[in-house]
Amino acid sequence: MGSLRHAWFNTSFSFPSSGFSGFCASPIEESHGALISSCNSRTMTDGLVTFRDVAIDFSQEEWECLDPAQRDLYVDVMLENYSNLVSLDLESTTYETKKIFSEKDIFEINFSQWEMKEKSKTLGLEASIFRNNWKCKSIFKGLKGCQEGYFSQMIISYEEIPSYRKSKSLTPHQSIHNTEKPYVYKERVNACSHGSKLVQHKRTHTAEKHFECKECGKNYLSAYQLNVHQRFHTGEKPYECKECGKTFSWGSSLVKHERIHTGEKPYECKECGKAFSRGYHLTQHQKIHIGVKSYKCKECGKAFFWGSSLAKHEIIHTGEKPYQCKECGKAFSRGYQLTQHQKIHTGKKPYECKICGKAFCWGYQLTRHQIFHTGEKPYECKECGKAFNCGSSLIQHARIHTGEKPYECKECGKAFSRGYHLSQHQKIHTGEKPFECKECGKAFSWGSSLVKHERVHTGEKSHECKECGKNFCSGYQLTRHQVFHTGEKPYECKECGKAFNCGSSLVQHERIHTGEKPYECKECGKAFSRGYHLTQHQKIHTGEKPFKCKECGKAFSWGSSLIKHERVHTNEKTYGCKDCGKAFGSGYQLSVHQRFHTGEKLYQCKEFGKTFTHGSKLVHERTCNDKPYKYKECGEAFLWTTYSNEKIDTDETL
C-alpha cells in the first residue's frame, strides 16, 4: 500500500471498538484496530500516538484496484477514526497544557478529495492540531505543501493571522471561505462541509442515538443535543435580556426575543411586503400565499399548512393534556399554554407598549396590541372585504362564510369554528371555574374573563373611541362599538335578511328562527339560546349580586346591569338616533327605537301570524293567549293570580 504520513497526537483517551466485516485482515481494518489498541495501551507518560498507526494512503493506481466492498469499508473506517480524533479536539485540554509543538509550526493532515466512479460519494478529511490556536488556512501567507498520492501532509509556517481557540470555532469559519461541501452521504444527496457533520448526518439514517438522558431516558444523536435537552430538567437559563430581565436557555432565543424590544423585522415577504422578526414566521406566512395545505388529519380530514399545526390539532381528538400547572392543577394540551397560564399566578407582565405604557404577559399580545395604534390590517376577506390585522383572524373569519365547524363537543355534539371556543364550551359541562377574583370572590372558567371582571372593580378603561371619546375595558368592546359609527353590517341572516355587525350576533340571532336552546339550567330545567343568558339566569337561584353602585348602593347580579344603572345618575346618553335626534343610554335601546322608523317587525307569532318589532312583545302575546289561572266559580281565566284575587275581592265574578 502507499506511504504513510505523520501526524502527532498527545492523548490518553480510549475509543470504543466496533467490528467490521467484508474481507479479512485488510490494512483498512488494521488501521482502525491500531487506533484503538494504541490509544488503549499508551498513557500520558508513554509518549505520543502517531497517525502513522491509523492512516493509510493510496495512490491512484492502488485505489483503482480496490473492489466496491473494500472502498465502502475504507470510508466507514476512516470516518470513524476521524470522528474519534475530532472528539479529542473538542474535549481534551491537552493542547492547552502541554507544550508539544512550537507556535511557528502546524502539523496538518490533509486528506485530499477522492471520488468513486461507481457511486456518487466524496470524502475530504482535514484537521489541524497544535498547542494553543487553530489558524484559518485560507489566508495563510507563504503556503507550502507537497502531495504524493491521494493523501498528503503540509507543514506550514505562518505570520500573524486570525486564530480560534477550539477546532469547533475554526471549522465553521473555514466554510465561509469555501462553500464547498465535500462530504456526500450515499443514502441521499445531502452535502456536509465537515467530516464530523457527515458522521452525525449518517446517524439520522441509521437512527443511531448514543447519548441518553439519565433523567427521562430520551436518546439524542449528539452530546450537544443532549446538553441542550438537559436544560429542561435543570431549568438553567444563562442568557438574560438587558431590556426586561427575561432569561433564556439558549442564546438564539435571546437574539429572537430582543427583536421584540428593537422592533427589528429582517425577514420580508416578497409577495405582500410584510416583515417578520424570525425566518420561521416568514416561511409560515408564505404558505398563505401558496395556499398549499399538505398536512391532513386522519381523524376529521382537516388540512393544515404546517406539520406543527396538525400535531396541535390532533390533541383535540385525543383529549390529551400532559402539561399540568403545579399551582392550581389545571392541565393543558400544549406546553406554551401552561407557560402562558402560569403568568396569571405570578402576575408578571414584562412586555410594555412604548406608545401607551400598557404591559402584557406575552410578546405576541404586545405585537397584536401595537396594531391598534397603527391601525394596520393587511389581511382582507375576499368574500366580504373585511380586513384583519393577523392571518389567523382571517382564517377564522372565513369559516363564517363557509359554515365550517371542525371542532365538535363529545358531550352534546355541538360544533364550533374555533378550537378555543370548544375549550370554553366544555367548561359549561364540567362547571370548572379555577380563576377567582380576590376582590369579591367570584370565580370564572377562563383567565380572560377574570381579567375583564377585575376592571369592574378598578374602573380601568384603557381603550378609547376616537369618534366619540367613549372608553372601554377591552379592545373587543371598542371594535364592536365602532361599528355603530360606521353602520357596517356585513353579516346577513338568510332567513329574514336582518344584518349584523359581527358574526357571533348572527349565530345567536339564527337561534330565534331555529328555536335552538342548547344551554339548560340544572336547577329548574329552563333552557337558553345563549350561554351568557344561562349564566345570568343562574344568579336568580343563587341570589348573588356582586356589583354594587357607589352612588346609591344598589346591587346587581351582572356588571352590565350596573353600567346601565350608573347612567341613571350621570344621565349619559351617547347613542343618538340619526332620524329624530333622540338619544339613548345604550346601543340596544337605539336599535330597538330605530325599528319604529323602519317599521321592521322581525318576530312573528306562529299561532296567529301576527308580527312584532320586539321579541318581548311576541312573548307577551303568547302569554295573553295562555291564561293558566281560572276562577272556579265562573271559569274566567287570568294571566296572573293577583288579578284573579282582585276579582274575588271585588265580587266581580259573582
From Swiss-Prot:
Which parts of the sequence belong to the KRAB domain? 49-122
Top-level lineage group: Eukaryota
Q: Which controlled-vocabulary keywords does the entry list?
A: DNA-binding, Isopeptide bond, Metal-binding, Nucleus, Repeat, Transcription, Transcription regulation, Ubl conjugation, Zinc, Zinc-finger
Q: Which residues form a coiled coil?
A: none
Quote the Pfam families the UniProt record gives.
KRAB, zf-C2H2, zf-C2H2_6
Q: Name one GO molecular function term.
A: DNA-binding transcription factor activity, RNA polymerase II-specific
| Residue ranges covered by zinc fingers (C2H2-type) | 183-205, 211-233, 239-261, 267-289, 295-317, 323-345, 351-373, 379-401, 407-429, 435-457, 463-485, 491-513, 519-541, 547-569, 575-597
Give the family, as the similarity comment puts it. Belongs to the krueppel C2H2-type zinc-finger protein family.
Outline what the protein does.
May be involved in transcriptional regulation.
**Official protein name in the record:** Zinc finger protein 283
